[in-house]
């Protein structure tokens, strides 16, 4: 399993982040744990991330495609989408991540050290690889949101239409496979 920010913490509040409906919680958690293991990224759980977000001590890097982000996003998230080639390289040879030019890396280097940087995607795979890569590039810890925006939403985290900043009650799940894990059947996977 990947590293966790909360390892050794006797507060099992992240267990409440085991998200979804229809009895799929264990299945989703197993999948997310496998993503954590694959990427070797350091994890932060939704409740802890939400607390930092409320305190203004968190920057979310949304590593989903722009169309996913534009549908629903964690408030104030910045988009940095990996390319298909970058994802293929990093998942097969362990290096070579490439990004679409959504946000310059120089901008990320300006984030104060007392602010936690967290990558997020749908369920934690893309963002896990990006968190590991960005940790190296930025020479500082970059965490992965365990379970992605699905866990954030299921834990009661606010998601918004980033163009209007109005709260929405659905999450774009990239594909049909992940939609079933969003509480209340609020997963959308259209282009």
Where are these regions (language model features)?
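Short, surface-exposed ligand- or partner-binding patches at beta-edge/loop junctions that are enriched
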Residues: 120
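Rhodanese-like catalytic fold shared by cysteine-dependent sulfurtransferases
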Residues: 2-47, 54-55, 66-116, 127-191
């Amino acid at each position: 399993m990947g590293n966790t920010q909360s390892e050794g913490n006797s507060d099992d509040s992240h267990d409440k982040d085991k998200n979804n409906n229809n009895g799929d919680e264990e299945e989703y958690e197993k999948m997310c744990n496998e993503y954590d293991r694959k990427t070797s990224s350091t994890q932060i759980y939704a409740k802890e991330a939400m607390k930092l977000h409320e305190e203004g001590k968190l920057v979310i890097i949304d590593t989903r495609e722009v169309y996913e982000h534009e549908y629903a996003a964690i408030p104030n998230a910045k988009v940095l989408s990996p390319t298909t080639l970058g994802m293929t390289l990093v998942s097969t040879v362990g290096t070579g991540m490439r990004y679409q030019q959504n946000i310059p890396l120089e901008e990320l280097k300006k984030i104060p050290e007392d602010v936690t940087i967290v990558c997020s995607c749908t369920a934690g795979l893309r963002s896990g690889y990006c968190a590991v890569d960005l940790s190296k590039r930025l020479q500082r810890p970059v965490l992965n949101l365990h379970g992605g925006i699905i866990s954030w939403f299921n834990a009661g985290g606010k998601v918004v239409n980033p163009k209007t900043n109005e709260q929405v009650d659905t999450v774009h799940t990239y594909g049909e496979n992940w939609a079933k894990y969003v509480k209340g059947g609020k997963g959308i996977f259209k282009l």
